[in-house]
């Protein structure tokens, strides 16, 4: 079939009319042309299909002490297993990990209690996603008993948990040599234990000035004595921040309603900043001041900041 100028106009008109949501197969069916011919015509008159602009992640964060915030997450590692991991946000030190079959509340509680007992200390804030195991009454009760402020991230938003997500990818990369093999629970345990040992004690991390995670976590400079008095000061700072933000229940520190999570997260960050435990800034204002790519475009950053909150 000869492709006339009128037919080309019709193809372009269909594409514009339906805002480029019709693919070449659909348009080809309507005008009785092959999808490859339609694609060539659209490439000539329209160019690439319009794409939604992606908002760059330009906010950077930095925790100034250990045990300010811990974050927990489940990682699907394969062979029917999930890996439950908890990490210190300041140093990237992996505090604990457990293989589990499913996301169960009691598994999270046992995991958390084991870390708290072994480390002999607790964080000021505990970050987690909206999985039912973390939002369960038993885990929330544990946080309340230990006077740990909960920090649920926004639902379906893994990009706000950037440091933890990159750590999860490192776990997957470590297990690549096992793909396609039959692996027992004992073998998988050994492989993960070895990977975590290297991750904590052997690997120099660029974002830590090429120091090791364990070296940073256990250094005296990073120590935070989060005793009852410090927790009381932080709780008061959090209440003050919520009051300034106009939260309906500013006195809610350890129990938060789902409708108030967004204000709660902002108040936590403000309170941590006030106590000198956390910094955040936007690099967008700095773009154009230096030669080379902007920091927002650099994926493998080597400075001691992240976008994980």
Give the positions of each predicted feature.
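Basic, flexible linker segments flanking DNA-binding modules
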Residues: 1-69, 157-158
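Mobile genetic element proteins and their domesticated derivatives, centered on retroelements
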Residues: 11, 27, 38, 73, ...
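Mobile-element integrase/transposase regions
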Residues: 36-87, 93, 105-114, 118-124, ...
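Hydrophobic alpha-helical segments, especially N-terminal targeting/anchoring helices
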Residues: 87-88, 158
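A short acidic/small-residue loop/turn micro-motif
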Residues: 100-104
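RNase H-like two-metal-ion nuclease catalytic core shared by retroviral integrases
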Residues: 128-130, 134-145, 150-176, 184-193, ...
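C-terminal domain-tail junction helix/linker
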Residues: 173-309
